[in-house]
Amino acid sequence: MASSEQQIRFEHWANSQSLEAIVAASHGLPEALALVGHIVSISCFWAARVEGTAGNLDPWPTFTAPELETELRQLLDRWLRLSRCTAMDAQVRYVSSDGESRSNLFSEVLQEVLLHGAHHRGQIALVLRMKGFEPPRSTDFIPALRTAAIQKGI
């Protein structure tokens, strides 16, 4: 199994690939930018839960492409820090969106963030293709390993 650091670096790389494809599609395609913004927002939301500081976040914020580049870099640093100081089997206690007290392992939270991002990256690729633009060549894990981008850091 890939290390948590490798998974986090992959998530950053894949999200960055999607954002680059959106930017290359001329005017940035607001619906595709909104999906990247949603990925960022939900990732921030889960990071805040791990940190014990969760509050109300807008799940669909509006960002520009340069703002998203900055947000993605900050998320990479934040999740790398969390993975270094949080055991994979640590309990993350939080209040869910339905107001219920919940608890999940840090490893489960990380998997949620990764799978959520993958889901929306698929939607981004579809939006790009439907609008006549090229999606990223790949945002899959194995091709990412071949680039070495997630091995040595980005």
Give the ranges of each region predicted by the language model:
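Helix-adjacent hinge/juxtasegments
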Residues: 54-96
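Short, contiguous alpha-helical
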Residues: 5-61, 98-154
